[in-house]
Regions:
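N-terminal metal-binding scaffold of metallo-dependent hydrolase/deaminase domains
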Residues: 1-48, 53-59
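Divalent metal-coordination and catalytic microenvironments
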Residues: 14, 30, 35, 56, ...
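Metal-associated gating/positioning segment near the N- to mid-region
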Residues: 54-139
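Hydrophobic faces of well-ordered beta-strands that scaffold small-molecule active sites
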Residues: 62-66, 123-125, 148-153, 186-190, ...
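Gly-rich Lys/Arg/Thr-decorated short loops/hinges at beta-loop-alpha junctions or inter-strand turns
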Residues: 89-94, 115-117, 157-159, 196-211
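Mid-domain alpha/beta scaffold segments of enzyme catalytic cores
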Residues: 129-172
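Active-site neighborhoods of metal-dependent hydrolases
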Residues: 175-229, 245-258, 262-385
Length: 385
């Protein structure tokens, strides 16, 4: 690299992959001016530019983790629950980096460095309670290198459920829009709709058409209503769904039926004001995002006949354009599982007996945290892997 001005840079001779510009492994140069990629540099700028020779290497946009848990109260509950986790991985302070610790739940500095080392530049916190938004933003701001955002949980919000029960989509949309603007959220998250509200009374819902206790609104109505709100507001991302019955044998059918709920909606993402010019359209075709699909891909009717339902769910997903997913794959070894689905975590606690934490956010949502070890010797874990 030339020891010269940092205002301009050229990354040369790399194999470039850029789906939005229909570039698939071509050898191209990347020109950067003041931190932004540009189409070209002037002769004077190119002469003074720092040069990185990426010959034989892959060059691609920074990775985007669309679903993670990296900031907020449940993450800190995990850090407090797992002092042993911090001994497993310790990063010493250097001249340009902070110290940090933590393996499955790293400190904010360390998680920023770890993500960057893997090539990620953007990470989203997938469950931000409105009452805990300020602290979530504090931690995201303290995380180095990464661009970050958060999804706000609405699937068990009292006001949302009341408006949907009344059939007033416009009022629900106005409420969601105000909440997102006030709390600086990026998207709408829906976690075990109707079930988390029931968990405040030690109950859950078992199906999409079972009404919850006090609002008498079903999971199906909440998913459909929030998806309609999402498109009415023209958000850049789809409704982010954590399906009902997560982690239970046979739940792939619940996941499939949940995805079918939004299939008749027309996607409406308003990206004109914020999207850079690209060769491929930035308009999304999807109306629902299924989070950590692996945990919603179980077959069988009990743990005795548990099997993978992934082929069946994948077959449906591949036949439709309204769905986008992340796999939610798990590696073997220690984990600190955390979710806005309190009853699912309690079920896991009853199976494993590991350290468990539960929290209820009044009128809004809940969460659960559990330490876990994924084992090669476990038939269930091996099937999940």
């Amino acid at each position: 690299m030339a020891a010269n001005s940092t205002k301009t840079m050229i990354i040369k001779n790399g194999y470039l992959f850029d789906p939005l510009n229909a570039i698939d492994g071509e050898v191209k140069d990347i020109f950067i001016r003041e931190g932004k990629v540009v189409s070209s540099l002037s002769g004077h700028e190119a002469k003074d530019a720092a040069v990185i020779d990426a010959r034989g290497k892959t060059v691609m946009p920074g990775g985007v983790d669309a679903h993670s848990h990296v900031a907020g109260t449940k993450v800190n509950a995990g850090r407090l629950m797992r002092p042993e986790d911090h001994y497993k991985s310790v990063r010493k302070k250097t001249d340009i980096t902070h110290s940090g610790s933590g393996y499955t739940v790293p400190s904010v500095y360390k998680q920023g460095y770890d993500y960057a080392a893997m090539g990620y530049t953007t990470v989203f916190e997938a469950a931000m309670p409105p009452l805990e938004a300020r602290h979530t933003h504090e931690e995201m701001r303290a995380t180095p290198i990464l661009d970050m955002g958060a999804y706000m949980v609405f699937g068990n919000n009292w006001f949302v459920m009341r408006y949907l029960k009344e059939g007033d989509i416009e009022k629900a949309a106005a409420y969601v829009a105000w909440m997102m603007r006030t709390h600086k959220a990026y998207g709408i998250k829906c976690v075990n709709p109707a079930g988390v509200e029931n968990w405040g009374w030690a109950k859950n819902v078992k199906g999409l058409d079972e009404p919850n206790i006090h609002f008498e609104v079903t999971s199906r109505e909440i998913i459909r209503g929030l998806a309609e709100v999402n498109e009415l507001l023209g958000l850049p991302m789809s409704l982010h769904l954590h399906a009902n019955n997560l982690g239970h044998p046979g739940n792939w059918e619940t996941a499939r039926d949940s995805l079918m709920i939004t299939s008749s909606l027309e996607p409406n993402s308003k990206t004109e004001l914020e999207w850079a010019q690209t060769r491929e359209s930035a308009k999304r075709k999807q109306t629902v995002y299924l989070a950590h699909a692996q945990f919603s891909s179980y077959g069988g009717s009990s743990w005795r006949d548990f099997c993978s339902g992934a082929p069946d769910l994948a077959k449906y997903i591949n036949q439709t354009e309204n769905v986008v997913i992340d796999s939610g794959s798990v590696p073997f070894g220690p984990a600190t599982t955390m979710t806005g689905d309190g009853p699912a975590q309690h079920d896991l606690y009853m199976l494993t007996g590991q350290k468990w934490s539960n929290c209820d956010i009044e009128m809004e949502c809940g969460s659960g945290v559990l330490s876990l070890m994924y084992l090669k010797s476990s038939p269930v874990h091996a099937t999940m892997w």
